[in-house]
Amino acid sequence: MPQIKSAIKRVKTQEAARVRNIAQMNAMRTAVKKFKTATEQNADNSQDLYKAAARAIDMANSKGLIKKNKAGRDKSRLSALLNK
């Protein structure tokens, strides 16, 4: 456990950021899973779910949770599923 005041503050800040990052990643994964299940079942709202998933991927990328290449690769794969 840190003894220095600034280190104690850093631990609190890091914990808050960790919780926020986990929530953002979970939201992204959920959006992608919803889109994939919708495309497998040939649902009508797959276009809307694609937009939501792409937006979630972009948000995770902009927050530094995933790298730029992974974001592009994931979006490309989702669009290929959509156009199939």
From Swiss-Prot:
UniProt keyword annotation of Nucleus present: no
InterPro entries for the chain: Ribosomal_bS20 (IPR002583), Ribosomal_bS20_sf (IPR036510)
Any one Gene Ontology BP term: translation
Keywords recorded for this protein, A-Z: Ribonucleoprotein, Ribosomal protein, RNA-binding, rRNA-binding
KW rRNA-binding (keyword) present: yes
GO cellular component: cytosol; small ribosomal subunit
Disulfide topology: none
Gene3D superfamilies reported in the protein's UniProt record: Ribosomal protein S20
Molecular function terms from GO: small ribosomal subunit rRNA binding; structural constituent of ribosome
Entry-linked HAMAP family: Ribosomal_bS20
Function: Binds directly to 16S ribosomal RNA.
Sequence similarity: Belongs to the bacterial ribosomal protein bS20 family.
Protein name as catalogued: Small ribosomal subunit protein bS20
Organism encoding this protein: Lacticaseibacillus paracasei (strain ATCC 334 / BCRC 17002 / CCUG 31169 / CIP 107868 / KCTC 3260 / NRRL B-441)
